[in-house]
Amino acid sequence: MKKILSFCAVLLMACSVNAQAQTNAQQNVSDAKAGQAQLLPWETPRDTTCHEVLLETTLGNIRVALYNDTPHHRDNFLKLVNSGYYNGCIFQRVIKNFMIQGGDYSCRKVNLGKVEKFDVDYTVPAEIIYPKYYHKRGQLCAAREGDDENPTKASASTDFYITWGRNFSPRQMEYYVEKEKREGKSYAIPSAELQQGYIKYGGVPHLDNGYTVFGEVLEGMDVVGKIQNVATNKENNDRPLDDIVITKATQVK
């Protein structure tokens, strides 16, 4: 009888341990999901009145929101979307652990026999709102010519990129800051608050305060992740070996 009772006690203890482990695992998953939704103390909630655009690509869909406090870029992007310009554009430049870039006029794939004319010979005035908008992972940003040709940092009319960047541990962020200090790049050192943002989200801090960030990815970061992982031709300006096409861009809000 004692042996039976001892066995039952061990069995109950094992069941209790397993149940607690499952509870802890479920709690960890819940905490992780909650953490993704939680903002850092200095962050402000996204403006829910923002216009939204759905980019349907050959690797999946990406839904983006356009910031209202970058109105020139918002309106320009919506104009291009609603004119059909982005239908047939490709992501022509992709760099792993950095960003994916699309929208270049010279790389559009149009249907044979279809005549399309778009006026893209213009720039968009810079709307750099830093540090409110910085280059954390998943930001929609405007490409541009370099500072020598473009000291005002005006954006290209059609080219955009979505950030991916790298993940930072606290020690890696410290190392990054130390490196930028040694190289005299004080302009590339994020504030203490932004350092916490890069540790939480990942991103590309050296682009901060140099390019206009005008939106963010709402859905489809898994697709962005797939795109930034594709094989590319580094001798052809990092163009993917197989074209990744934006088959359709639609304003959905």
Task: State each model region's role.
Residues 1-23:
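Bacterial Sec-dependent N-terminal signal peptides
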